[in-house]
């Protein structure tokens, strides 16, 4: 994001959001954010804080407050870290609150300075994660308006004037 802005200009990246996971951010992303502030970039970065290192098997990382053995350990505060790097615009959203996410992205893309959006929700693959109840589709109430399609859920589809919901067993079962 920052390199593209410097190479092509601010208008080129005005609607871009760089996305990085919490673990990868701590592994390789901190320096990039430092460079954004130092070089007066204007981009928006979204950190997906899911409280695990999903890409390698769901290990602990410095944002979880536990070490690799699951014992208590120091916890990196992502908001404080981003502010310490020089970001004035740091906000946290719940990715289940789509309206809040949309508002955050819209506002931060319009900002004239670099900004951070931390999307925080524990990974559904972590044991003990509290889940919202599963959704259901009431076919009798379906009007065929396709409003359900606007959330972008891959489990919801629309065929022959009917909203369909794909269900499968939970990977934790």
Predicted regions and their residues:
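Acidic, glycine-enriched active-site microenvironments
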Residues: 163
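Glycine/aspartate-rich loop-and-adjacent alpha/beta segment that forms the canonical ThDP
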Residues: 107-158
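Conserved small/polar residues in nucleotide/adenosyl-binding loops
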Residues: 166-173
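Short, exposed beta-strand "edge-strand" segments with a Pro/Gly-rich flavor and a Y/T-containing core
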Residues: 71-74, 131-136, 169
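Thiamine diphosphate
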Residues: 1-116, 129
């Amino acid at each position: 994001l920052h390199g593209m802005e410097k190479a092509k200009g601010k208008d080129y990246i005005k609607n871009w959001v760089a996305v990085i996971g919490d673990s990868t951010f701590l592994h390789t992303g901190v320096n990039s954010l430092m460079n954004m502030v130092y070089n007066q970039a204007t981009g928006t970065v979204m950190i997906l804080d899911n409280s695990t290192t999903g890409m390698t098997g769901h290990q602990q990382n410095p944002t979880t407050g536990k070490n690799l053995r699951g014992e208590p350990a120091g916890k990196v505060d992502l908001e404080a870290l981003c502010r310490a790097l020089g970001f004035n615009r740091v906000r946290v959203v719940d990715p289940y609150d789509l309206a809040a996410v949309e508002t955050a992205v819209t506002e931060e893309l319009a900002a004239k300075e670099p900004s951070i959006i931390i999307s925080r929700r524990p990974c559904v693959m972590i044991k003990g994660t509290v889940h919202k109840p599963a959704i259901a589709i009431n076919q009798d109430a379906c009007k065929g308006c396709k409003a359900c399609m606007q959330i972008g859920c891959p489990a919801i589809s629309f065929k022959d004037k009917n909203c369909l919901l794909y269900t499968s067993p939970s990977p934790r079962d």
